[in-house]
């Protein structure tokens, strides 16, 4: 089985990548992180595909609050959609594609069109459910 992964940041997806690599099942992992930040991830460099052009400036910008909510939200949207489009354009042949829900709509469609199974990974529960749980706990 060949598995391709997509994550605009790092999160738990790199743990999954290491487990898949240990079983010779990792085809590729796409990330918005710059390559120099990934040297100690324990993965073969040829399996890591980076697209840091929007995410790195976003992460490094020290005063996002001065931009206003609309600008930050637009930047986050562009970060996810440009990354997703990049992954869709560079999708390798694979049996399974796992992408985080915020940035894998186009790439998930591309993977399915190529015959792969698509797993839309939601790293946490829905925000409405989180709010409900917190309200119950603090009532």
Model-inferred region functions:
Residues 4-7, 87-104, 110-121:
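Short N-terminal targeting/anchoring amphipathic segment
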């Amino acid at each position: 089985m060949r598995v391709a992964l997509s994550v605009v940041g790092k999160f738990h997806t790199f743990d999954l990548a290491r487990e898949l690599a240990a079983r010779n099942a990792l085809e590729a992992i796409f990330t918005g992180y710059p390559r120099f930040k990934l040297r100690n991830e324990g993965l073969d460099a040829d399996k890591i595909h980076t697209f840091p052009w929007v995410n790195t400036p976003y992460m490094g910008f020290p005063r996002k609050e001065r931009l206003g909510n609309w600008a930050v939200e637009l930047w986050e949207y562009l970060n996810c959609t440009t990354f997703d489009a990049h992954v869709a354009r560079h999708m390798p042949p694979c049996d399974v594609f796992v992408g985080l829900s915020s940035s894998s709509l186009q790439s998930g469609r591309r993977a399915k069109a190529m015959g792969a199974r698509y797993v839309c990974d939601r790293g946490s529960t829905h925000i409405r459910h989180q709010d409900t749980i917190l309200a119950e706990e603090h009532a």
